[in-house]
From Swiss-Prot:
Its EC number is 3.1.21.7. Pfam families: Endonuclease_5 (PF04493). GO terms for biological process: DNA repair. Mg(2+) binds at residues 35, 103. The lineage of its organism: Bacteria, Pseudomonadati, Pseudomonadota, Gammaproteobacteria, Enterobacterales. Its main location: cytoplasm. It is found in: Cytoplasm. This is Endonuclease V. The gene is nfi.
Length: 223
């Protein structure tokens, strides 16, 4: 594995990320959610894509793609491991979203190219990274109150907002992926909350990927 080459690719791609609001439809008609996981001891990469109507946030379509994992787990290079399955799921959607939430980092990455940014560039769609853990940078400790907010800073640059979406839950790291500003990323996530820790697009993507009860109930209703 030529990590030097991958690192150079990340730096080059990161320079093309658009950190300004460039939505083709504002407000969007459809918002997507994406989640990636691994099965069979990491041999299989699974990506779930969901499509929600906006502003109702009603689930209208989902796709799950499973492909052979193309590279090992290497911290800092996860997007190269995850994007092939994301692309496979994306290509199955009959309707593409106007805005995509990705479970993972956007520019809040040591080389400013998390999976939300990498995939957004790949398919040229506005994306937001919604991550559950810090990858780089520092932030002031948050109060325990829901809504507590702090900028994630690295080398004098704000990379994300750290936001406690729900009481007694760890905060989310919300960042520009591509074609969405940092402040707008936070605002869009806040508009897509329904009382859970995660915004509806990535909550549904996780539910579909993992076969959670909410998704099973939804399937039963559709029959």
């Amino acid at each position: 594995m030529d990590l030097a080459s991958l690192r150079a690719q990340q730096i080059e791609l990161a320079s093309s990320v658009c950190r300004e609001d460039r939505l083709d439809k504002d407000p969007p008609a459809f918002i997507g959610g994406a989640d990636v996981g691994f099965e069979q001891g990491g041999e299989v990469t699974r990506a779930a894509m969901v499509l929600l109507k906006y502003p109702s946030l009603e689930l209208v379509e989902y796709k799950v793609a499973r492909i052979a994992t193309t590279m090992p787990y290497i911290p800092g290079f996860l997007s190269f491991r995850e994007y092939p399955a994301l692309l496979a799921a994306w290509e199955q959607l009959s309707q593409k979203p106007d805005l995509l939430f990705v479970d993972g980092h956007g520019i809040s990455h040591p080389r400013r190219l998390g999976v939300a940014s990498h995939f957004g560039l790949l398919v040229d769609v506005p994306t937001i990274g919604v991550a559950k853990k810090r990858l780089c940078g520092k932030f002031e400790p948050l109060s325990t109150e829901p809504g507590a907010l702090s900028p994630l800073m690295d080398k004098g640059e704000q990379l994300a907002w750290v936001w406690r979406s729900k009481a007694r839950c760890n905060p989310l790291f919300i960042a520009t992926g591509h074609r969405v500003s940092t402040d707008s990323a936070l605002a869009w996530v806040q508009r897509c909350m329904k009382g859970y820790r995660l915004p509806e697009p990535t909550r549904w993507a996780d539910a579909v990927a993992s076969g959670r009860p909410a998704f099973i109930r939804w399937q039963e209703i559709q029959r």
